[in-house]
């Protein structure tokens, strides 16, 4: 849309009337006042934005909050001050929440029902589930009168056009991490289907509700509102939907090799209010060649862990083969209780006889590996416990006991890299974290991953060299020789300036009643390498992040707040005269 200033003035908000300001202009509407508006109106009473504003202007809320002048100026197509403009955008977000909250919730249900998990041996862009979600997003975009492009089934792009040349990229992703269905059980015994949104209380359980199909949905509906209300924009918005964010990470580079990079980039895949720093993502993958068991006693034949390197599961299960299962189960149960008591008592170890085998289960608390402090890692505890049995319960030595010794000697239950001696911290970004996560075994090898989250303060090459040197010393001492693969990415640290970032900070902190300051994250997103890249929600930093966990959920209140915030943000950023 190529609006002239005359047309802009006649349409709705007048871009020409806004002057650049060096301090953020606030919307004179508190979180409590917004809540009062939400309780006064409902979706059935809201037809369009102008009708909504007219009704708000006549309400007691407007009189109390002095909103009438802003609404009157807007409806009369008059020049708005920066503060008035921001009040109108705040009301736009509230309108979107009231008008489309129920529809957006239903769309989230539909997207979660598509299991967009990586399939072994199938490229993501050929996976039928991704073709299905691409068609669904295309259908939604077109029904919202938005432009849709499918870039070779790798990235889905939805565009909202403005009048200028600048482009703001809004980033979300359609892929999700794998699930272990048997772990999706609530404390009261309720079993959940990971790919069906289940509403219990205010929690919407389902894989992708938090990470990151919610981001796709709220961005689409925010675009819809701005489009159908014909609000003029000084720049374009592109919703860039990644398909490999949780795995190879090759879809976004593929996209930008063929398409221009937006000047500004916001990831709806992290934390509020505005995150300007992301730790670097790293992996220490140890591969233990399968070997014939040696010695006497029981043999551990299998062990489970996370299904992805960035996932701390709620349970780890090991299978023991023995001639005396009842006696072994009893001994493991007693040893497990003692071990749990010595190590915090915040996890459980259970041994049960299954035919001729014994199944050992360590139950902890699932977490995203970027926040190991929010969980209790059962993988680390399983391996450390197995290693602690040496000399107490007879076990044959094989590749799994080798891995247990490696884990116990080098990583232990500590997730700060202290045991290996590689820990360090940055005052703003926080400490390095190192979490035992992924476990896999085939007929050739047993694999065990440690997921690293690395702050600024030490170069990736230096850190890799430190880790490699210490692990090499351990292999010489232990005579256990796994193959190690190390990777460490640079952390992201930005010092953004300009009206755009002031606006982002104001929108998030005012709506969420948060401190007006930038944040940092241990999670890496699609904007890690992109210009002017920041995270803009959609999780609150003081609330446990449930993405990647068993029993992932998003609260209905926060989901609707996200819709409100993202709509307000797009209206406000879209109409700033200068970013």
Predicted regions mapped to residue ranges:
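C-terminal catalytic subdomain
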Residues: 441-464
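Acidic-enriched catalytic cores of C-N bond-cleaving enzymes acting on peptides and small amides
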Residues: 276-304, 309-362, 369-433, 437, ...
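A short beta-alpha structural unit
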Residues: 401-408, 437, 451-456, 481-501, ...
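Gram-negative bacterial Sec-dependent N-terminal signal peptides
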Residues: 1-27
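Acidic/His- and Gly-rich active-site-bordering loop/insert found
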Residues: 28-205, 233
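Acidic/histidine-rich catalytic neighborhood of metal-dependent amide-processing enzymes
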Residues: 212-291, 333, 414-427
